[in-house]
Amino acid sequence: MTRSDELFEQAKKTIPGGVNSPVRAFSGVGGSPRFIEKADGAYIFDADGKKYIDYVGSWGPMILGHNHPKIREAVLKAVENGLSFGAPTELEITMAEKVIEMVPSIEQVRMVSSGTEATMSAIRLARGFTNRDKILKFEGCYHGHADCLLVKAGSGALTLGQPSSPGIPEDFAKHTLTATYNDLDSVKAIFEQYPEEISCIIIEPVAGNMNCIPPIDGFLQGLRAICDQYGALMIIDEVMTGFRVSKSGAQGHYGVTPDLTTLGKVIGGGMPVGAFGGRKDVMQFIAPTGPVYQAGTLSGNPIAMSAGLAQMEALCEEGVYEQLAAKTQYIAEGFKAAANKHGIPMAINYVGGMFGFFFTSEETVTNFAQVTKCDTALFAEFYHMMLDEGVYLAPSAYEAGFLSLAHGEEELEATLAAADRVFAKLAKA
């Protein structure tokens, strides 16, 4: 039994399932999760001292790599002045100005402590601003664990949503409508049925919780037009894609302007943080200037703001996103080439610093229905073989992979060599 095995058994005695977020339990791939002791650059190290090339990056925020000296120094300097004040700080202003500078659609921004807080607050604001109750989300997209967002599609294309978790009353879920990602016709049909009841559309511009599904050409622009036609707000959830896909997020990459944007992960440099922002007239509707209530004791925490600012400043340096995109393309296409070499059917998607691969015979994967038909058993086998090779991928066939600037030629080549060996073994099985 490894030290990680021992820790997992110990954790299950005091923590539900032994983890503090379900995907960490390895339920999607089987076996025991690796308990991590430290991380540096492109690597993480488990409790048994084993070193892995990391393609999870704490689920996205580690764009510069783990334990980056600029972020570490910013945190240590901030700690000297105290941990939390529950009062305004100049750091909050500096962070707000930096976000607004980088994302043109954001005119004002409110800091919170998590991505879930950001999406939950943005939806409440959209409902209050429009005086409408219903929201529209997309099948396979994840926006945090607020009650109104843990909803799946009903039994027909135009039926009301059904709770996807116990503990959510159907009275809550009925206000959440679910459309098909990358299918404008499904969105139009729902708006035609509820033309004056939908407050907002919320969408991951690149769906990162059904692996990695970019929008097809014109999809985001079509959603913008539908929102304008029916007087609904468009919320782009950039908790995962913000400052990872491009300097101005996925919205900048694809050329679409939302009314509200949610952010998280990246703007904390690895610290717990989130934010939502957008049009000034909408943001002025939030307390204390408006009637929609939102608050948080740790919102704008000085340690998180310091870490985030250090990362954001580094991301503004010349050539950062070109490097990140090139590395991501190289690893994704390398996986595909290795799979093809050994006759393993695989499709790939990638954009900016995100990538995904799917064990399927389909050439392209563009929606949740296709994702659910992929070979998850083969993924689990591939996952553990790569883990044995010292490559740490997301432990679920439904999660995206992430590159960092710390991933160099050595790490990329070692990863692809490992993939080649694993695919060769799978082909013989």
Swiss-Prot record:
Its cofactor is pyridoxal 5'-phosphate. Pathway: Porphyrin-containing compound metabolism; protoporphyrin-IX biosynthesis; 5-aminolevulinate from L-glutamyl-tRNA(Glu): step 2/2. It catalyses: (S)-4-amino-5-oxopentanoate = 5-aminolevulinate. It is an enzyme of class 5 (isomerase). It holds the Pfam family Aminotran_3. GO terms for biological process: protoporphyrinogen IX biosynthetic process. Keywords: Cytoplasm, Isomerase, Porphyrin biosynthesis, Pyridoxal phosphate. GO terms for molecular function: glutamate-1-semialdehyde 2,1-aminomutase activity; pyridoxal phosphate binding; transaminase activity. Gene3D superfamilies: Aspartate Aminotransferase, domain 1, Type I PLP-dependent aspartate aminotransferase-like (Major domain). SUPFAM superfamilies: PLP-dependent transferases. GO terms for cellular component: cytoplasm. This is Glutamate-1-semialdehyde 2,1-aminomutase. It comes from Shewanella pealeana (strain ATCC 700345 / ANG-SQ1). The gene is hemL.
